[in-house]
Amino acid sequence: HVKKILNASYKDIPDNFKILTESEVSQVNNSHLQSPILPKQEPGTKPSNALAYELYVDGEINPSRKAIVLNLEASNKKFGDKALGAPFLIYAPGAFKNPTTNAFETASNWSFAVKPGDKLGYEWPLDAFEGGLYHLQVYGPNGYYREFKGNKNDPQLSLVSSYTADGGDNKTGIYKLDIENLSNTMLSIKVTDNAYQHGKKTIDLKPGEKKPVRVPTVKSQGWYDFTLIADGNDAFSRRYCGRLELGKDSISDPLMGGEMSINLS
């Protein structure tokens, strides 16, 4: 082993790589899924076991409008004693102020674990984000993902997630997002499917009005990916991705398998 290590120091420097041009780098950054340069995921899907996850992450500005609060939940309402807890990894991909050094850093992160039937909350002060613009990405198991963007001027909305079976064979479900206008002005909300060809919806809410948005997942066998924005507030957005778990086996993500095309325009 020592001889192999010593001999390795005399080997040629690897040269079996391609140096990318500026235009190729730009192409990859703009549309990595369509890039002919990057390695490709093998196309197609495979059977995927049911998992006893019933996870919810919702976020809102606190009453003083000085912090963004995320509530993490691993519910046991659907699976009872078989329900699973979950790890959550949360990133601030932009500049976030280190409380020890008081300097801005990128890719700050926090790890959480929530046991079955439990929930927890955590808050981040807005002044710790550069320019007061918060941006948090939440990663959970099996493709679970949430993204929160905004600032102190977020619209006064209540967003509560849930899901149910679609009435078929219980393999797929309907993601339900209850949207309530807590302000004293009219709000117009747009919900856009990013991957699974469900198009766009516009929801107009009078002051105090509450309406549900239902996102079907039958085309994608439980997988979903959609973004919510509010007219007149370019900083605010919420993104919801993952797979609805209903106790039945499904398939791996058809977007990852190249059977759907992503659209984030």
Question: How would you label these PLM feature ranges?
Answer:
Residues 1-265:
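Membrane-interface soluble catalytic domains
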